[in-house]
Amino acid sequence: MQKKILEYLKRLEEVEVEISNPEIFNNPKEYSLLSKEHARLSELKNTYDRVMAQEKVLSDDKQALAQEKDPEMIAMLEEGIQSGKAEVEKLYKILENLLVPPDPDDDLNVIMELRAGTGGDEAALFVGDCVRMYHLYASAKGWKYEVLSASESDIGGYKEYVMGISGTGVKRLLQYEAGTHRVQRVPETETQGRVHTSAITVAVLPEPAEDDEEVFIDEKDLKIDTFRASGAGGQHVNVTDSAVRITHLPTGVVVTCQDERSQHKNKAKAMRILKARIRDAEIQRRHKEASAMRSAQVGSGDRSERIRTYNFSQNRVTDHRIGLTLYSLDKVMEGDLDTITSALVSHAYHQLLQNGNEENS
């Protein structure tokens, strides 16, 4: 770890020289990248300085304890040493996270797609519950939340729901929500009080930046159909052909949007989803080819992987990837997801750091 820290501190000095060059302002994109790197490395240096200072205090307290005779002073020093050890441990965890090179996608916004799976109506209702959960979480984080597409079920809830979430740290915290979410509870229609199990799938697609050169879509590769929007049960809710279906012919990816009354707005939303899906498909393909990259993730990120179980009768939520169980499902469903998302991020960073150390050893 010490070797990595020294490498980053040297890089910080280089970045400070580069960013102080007046010519850097002629290249806004480069300046933006350097500014972000400078902020990250500065945080690392500040944390490292705090670790060194705390370890010095700890060392001094231990030396004083070895020579102290007064019982009250001994008790005070022992208490200080215990709290000092806890603080050093906490700072080292922060330092570990900062030592992991950032994912270039960390600053991207995301498109989340929730779909009802096994369980029929109950699964659709749980999609609705999770939509609300993510909406509340986004609000608590100060993120922008946007409905891109929604297909309601006949009894409430959604067969499919697509949302856009934007803000600082969105992708970093939400990326591990991808997978199968299983719910165990007694449906309102159940007269015998039996617990039913159903499931939904969640996809988290980083939304390509406007200047992303990797995602190029040629207009001639698109088949665009327009039709009248319909609501639950199939009834038409608009008398104009405002709904849009876009098919990307080379990949076969199909996106439908019908929530806006404007055909133009529906097309714009459909294109955003299409770009994100095409980009995600390419990333999934690369990950399958690079098994080393796969093993560094928390779980596979596969849509079919069961990642979490929500047991309502026990007020329990379990994340199977890291063995985390909380008996506060009621709070989680109200958008209190920080304990889960932070634990997943920390676990993933620790894995990446370990893999990096193994490669360098």
UniProtKB/Swiss-Prot annotation:
Compartments reported by the entry: Cytoplasm
Residue positions where N5-methylglutamine is found in the record: 235
Keywords for this protein: Cytoplasm, Methylation, Protein biosynthesis
Top-level taxonomic group: Bacteria
Free-text description of this protein's post-translational modifications in UniProt: Methylated by PrmC. Methylation increases the termination efficiency of RF1.
Pfam families: PCRF, RF-1
Cited InterPro entries: PCRF (IPR005139), Pep_chain_release_fac_I (IPR000352), Pep_chain_release_fac_I_sf (IPR045853), Prokaryotic/Mito_RF (IPR050057), RF-1 (IPR004373)
Gene Ontology cellular-component annotations: cytoplasm
Keyword Signal belongs to the record: no
SMART domains in UniProt: PCRF (SM00937)
UniProt-recorded Gene Ontology molecular function terms: translation release factor activity, codon specific
Main location: cytoplasm
General function of this protein: Peptide chain release factor 1 directs the termination of translation in response to the peptide chain termination codons UAG and UAA.
Family to which this protein belongs: Belongs to the prokaryotic/mitochondrial release factor family.
The protein, known as: Peptide chain release factor 1
Record organism: Chlamydia abortus (strain DSM 27085 / S26/3) (Chlamydophila abortus)
High-level lineage: Bacteria, Pseudomonadati, Chlamydiota, Chlamydiia, Chlamydiales
